């Protein structure tokens, strides 16, 4: 059977102990099967690359028709934001801790990747968020987020105050440590730790989860992902907005942050037999069936 993907980019976290041999094992295996292998230049040194082309991460979406990440969810997040504009699918090999998105164990890497290349996979489209920071009617920053956009206080110990709007309708004002605006993918990350709901990845929803609100009546809510969410900082020093916990922008009072669903979803390819609830039970150590 002809392989579906011919140009494959490999990405790994170079600082992870033992990652380079696994990366090169996969590269050699793919090349032996006839694929054109590209390697992210942040993942290996030129000497380690063994002659494979090294490319910038910003070029992955233009040059590859599949990207395989060896690492944890943090690496997946950074690559997801780069690939989404190009609709390039993503496969995750688990080298991290929890690995909610990297669902292929290392010892099954070669067999699972071969199956995916021959069309045996479970595709899943997941939304991203597009956020813009507006100051005095001018956009001063923008970014994509695969997990969440987090509005929070900085190093100063006091709470911040802000107002929240959905589709230009006032929802509430809040005094708290901040607010998490989460995708379904991000609902098992910071949002979950803050008391937010777990959202199935295919659910067309966005969760708004307060961080340590002063009023106990401020509870998480979920809205349709077609909505535009806006929050405005009304009082607070050293406040910031974070994108997937990897990028951030410092805020000033009266700054507004506008958040909406990004136009392109990201497609993740899972191995055959993937079951979301099995994954949750395993990763979160939920109780097993009694019979």
Swiss-Prot record:
- Reactions the enzyme catalyzes: NAD(+) + ATP = ADP + NADP(+) + H(+)
Which GO-annotated molecular functions does the record name? ATP binding; metal ion binding; NAD binding; NAD+ kinase activity
Q: Which residues are NAD(+)-binding?
A: 73-74, 147-148, 175, 177, 246
BP terms from Gene Ontology: NAD metabolic process; NADP biosynthetic process
UniProt-listed Pfam families: NAD_kinase, NAD_kinase_C
EC number per UniProt? 2.7.1.23
Q: Which domain of life is it from?
A: Bacteria
Which keywords annotate this record? ATP-binding, Cytoplasm, Kinase, NAD, NADP, Nucleotide-binding, Transferase
The record's active-site residues are 73
Q: GO cellular component terms?
A: cytoplasm
Names of the cofactor(s): a divalent metal cation
Subcellular location(s): the record lists: Cytoplasm
Q: What class of enzyme is it?
A: transferase
Cite the SUPFAM superfamilies for this sequence. Answer: NAD kinase/diacylglycerol kinase-like (SSF111331)
The family this protein is said to belong to: Belongs to the NAD kinase family.
Its function, per the record, reads:
Involved in the regulation of the intracellular balance of NAD and NADP, and is a key enzyme in the biosynthesis of NADP. Catalyzes specifically the phosphorylation on 2'-hydroxyl of the adenosine moiety of NAD to yield NADP.
The name under which this protein is listed is NAD kinase
Q: Native species of this protein?
A: Chromobacterium violaceum (strain ATCC 12472 / DSM 30191 / JCM 1249 / CCUG 213 / NBRC 12614 / NCIMB 9131 / NCTC 9757 / MK)
Q: What is the gene called?
A: nadK
